[in-house]
Amino acid sequence: GEHPDVSTAVTTTGWPLLDSSRGKAIFVLLGGGDLRADYHSKFPNLESATMFTMSVENTPESAIFSNTNPIGDAEEIQALVEAGYIVRSRADDAGGGEADNNETERRDKAIEIGAHSISTDYPTQVDGIEYWLDLNVRCNPISAPPDCSNDAIE
């Protein structure tokens, strides 16, 4: 492309708009450490790569980040979203008892700070637990243009 690296492209030009993205998929290598380093060595700046990698720090390959702590790291996540990166976060922690207690603070914060992808262990109702995640497609509260309409993106 016209940018020296992926990070510069997403933070200056941005991602393709929804109309030009419909029917397409994004692939992301979730593995980190040596696996990510090996992939980056084969595809410097992700040039000709089939998939993005999950970023942990700002590098030339950065495009998609994962931070599962929307409460404690809210400012960091929101700053990444504002910069143009895609951010994945979590709505709940199955091991932490949040769902058992119908605690929604983590979920609500992930939505509020603009996480694009919000993972859950409760995509449908579970017997004996009130909590479950039912998110509709919506305009991002941080990165969507002012004229964005939820109806237009469904």
Regions found by a protein language model. Name each.
Residues 1-154:
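Catalytic cores of phosphodiester-bond hydrolases, prominently lipid phosphodiesterases
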